[in-house]
């Protein structure tokens, strides 16, 4: 399946249905008052996270999503029907942004979580709302309000605890293969990995964490070199970064320069990401005799100015990977789970209620009567005998 992690869609909530101005006898208010019913509310649009989905690809082809408008009210106090809400299913990990205002609307990080993205229009009020004994019509506008319309950017961010960072060919995919059941492609050329991979690591029977392998970064990636830095967004939700450094690059480049290049790109992308705990993992130590490997790793660490959280491994031989995994698990357990901005169902209901109350109050305030002019109303007017 193709991995698509960014799409733009347009969502349109339904307009509120019109309330009806109805009189039983021509231009006269019947006993018991006018009886035009309210319209129905327009349908709202929600995005909901579904753990069974893992791509946004469907929305690349299906960009317009519209909820129905509420139906109009009718005479004899018939209220119009509220339209069904439209629920758009997206993968867990989807971040939502309003393209026009650049406002973040939320993150869907849990299965079933739902966010209101376009509110349906409020229904127009029928004239049955306006009780009066006089032969006068309501000034109240009876049209429903318009449904919200938004252009949204959806981004799928991997939900991983640990992110792998490094140059192409450093051995990131080999590492994820050695510590998890994930089997991404490994090859002796750069840019083997083109899409992110996730693996679940189980250091002990009842403990696990998720690790993300992303395409390699190169110097100048923030200016578009290589595959660019677009994949770094998948590391935004990680709590620890493992910077994989090839101690014996085949191209003869200097591991120290290589490491600085990666850190530089990280800062270019986001200072916040650069602040995350980042451990150094020297890889491919099997290419040297043990003592030489040890001396080389110490030298590189010293030149990088790092003294803590340094590991030397051979991903291919799975040597020294266990202590690393163990320490990662221990650190993760000591960290608070990050709290994401989310809107609960209750909050959505609350907002909706407040909206109703405001609209109802407005109609009370406007509850005066005036000489009625049919042309003021862009609605169907029903006269019944
Ligand atoms: N000798 C040795 N070779 C390794 C080790 N780890 C990875 N390699 C080799 O290095 C090459 C690149 O490995 P990958 O795991 O594909 O590297 P990557 O970082 O995922 O590369 P990209 O996907 O291109 O970013 C492959 O030929 C691997 O077999 C190691 O510990 N020792
Ligand atoms: Mg790879």
From Swiss-Prot:
SUPFAM superfamilies attached to this UniProt entry: Obg GTP-binding protein N-terminal domain, P-loop containing nucleoside triphosphate hydrolases
EC supergroup of this enzyme: hydrolase
Enzyme Commission code(s) on record: 3.6.5.-
Localization, UniProt: Cytoplasm
UniProt keyword list: Cytoplasm, GTP-binding, Hydrolase, Magnesium, Metal-binding, Nucleotide-binding
Listed Gene3D superfamilies: GTP1/OBG domain, P-loop containing nucleotide triphosphate hydrolases
InterPro entries from the UniProt entry: G_OBG, GTP-bd, GTP-bd_Obg/CgtA, GTP1-OBG_CS, GTP1_OBG_dom, GTP1_OBG_dom_sf, OBG_GTPase, P-loop_NTPase
Residues reported to bind GTP: 166-173, 191-195, 213-216, 283-286, 314-316
GO molecular function annotation: GTP binding; GTPase activity; magnesium ion binding
Record bears the keyword Cytoplasm: yes
A Gene Ontology BP annotation from the UniProt entry: ribosome biogenesis
GO cellular component: cytoplasm
Function: An essential GTPase which binds GTP, GDP and possibly (p)ppGpp with moderate affinity, with high nucleotide exchange rates and a fairly low GTP hydrolysis rate. Plays a role in control of the cell cycle, stress response, ribosome biogenesis and in those bacteria that undergo differentiation, in morphogenesis control.
Similarity annotation: Belongs to the TRAFAC class OBG-HflX-like GTPase superfamily. OBG GTPase family.
Subunit-level organization: Monomer.
Listed name of the protein: GTPase Obg
Source species taxonomy: Bacteria, Pseudomonadati, Pseudomonadota, Gammaproteobacteria, Alteromonadales
């Amino acid at each position: 399946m193709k991995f698509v992690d960014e799409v733009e869609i347009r969502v349109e909530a339904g307009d509120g249905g019109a309330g009806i101005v109805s009189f039983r006898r021509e231009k006269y208010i019947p006993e018991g008052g006018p009886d035009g019913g309210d319209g129905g509310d327009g349908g709202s649009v929600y995005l909901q996270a579904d753990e069974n989905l893992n791509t946004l690809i469907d929305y690349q082809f299906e960009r317009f999503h519209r909820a129905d408008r509420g139906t109009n009210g009718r005479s004899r106090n018939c209220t119009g029907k509220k339209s069904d809400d439209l629920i758009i299913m997206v993968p867990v990990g989807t971040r939502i942004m309003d393209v026009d205002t650049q406002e973040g609307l939320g993150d869907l990080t849990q299965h079933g979580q739902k966010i209101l993205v376009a509110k349906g229009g409020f229904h127009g009020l029928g004239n049955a709302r306006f009780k009066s004994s006089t032969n006068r019509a309501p000034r109240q506008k009876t049209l429903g309000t318009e449904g919200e319309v938004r252009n949204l950017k959806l981004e799928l961010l991997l939900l991983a605890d640990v992110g792998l960072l490094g140059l192409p060919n450093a051995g990131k995919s080999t590492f994820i293969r050695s510590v998890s059941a994930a089997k991404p492609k490994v090859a002796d050329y750069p840019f083997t990995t083109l899409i992110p991979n996730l693996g679940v690591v189980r250091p002990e029977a009842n403990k696990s964490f998720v690790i993300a392998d992303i395409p390699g970064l190169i110097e100048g990636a923030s200016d578009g070199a290589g595959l660019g830095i677009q994949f770094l967004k998948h590391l935004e939700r990680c709590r620890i970064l493992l910077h994989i450094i090839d101690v014996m690059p085949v191209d003869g480049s200097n591991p120290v320069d290589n490491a600085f290049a990666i850190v530089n790109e990280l800062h270019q992308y986001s200072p916040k990401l650069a602040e995350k705990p980042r451990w150094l993992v020297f890889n491919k130590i099997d290419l040297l005799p043990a003592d030489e490997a040890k001396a080389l790793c110490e030298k590189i660490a010293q030149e990088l100015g790092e003294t803590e959280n340094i590991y030397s491994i051979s991903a291919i031989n799975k040597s020294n990977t266990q202590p690393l995994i163990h320490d990662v698990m221990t650190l993760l357990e000591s960290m608070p789970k990050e709290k994401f901005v989310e809107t609960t169902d209750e909050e959505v209901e609350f907002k909706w209620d407040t909206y109703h109350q405001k609209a109802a109050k407005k109609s009370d305030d406007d509850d005066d009567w005036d000489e009625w002019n049919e042309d003021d109303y862009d609605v169907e007017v029903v006269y019944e005998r």
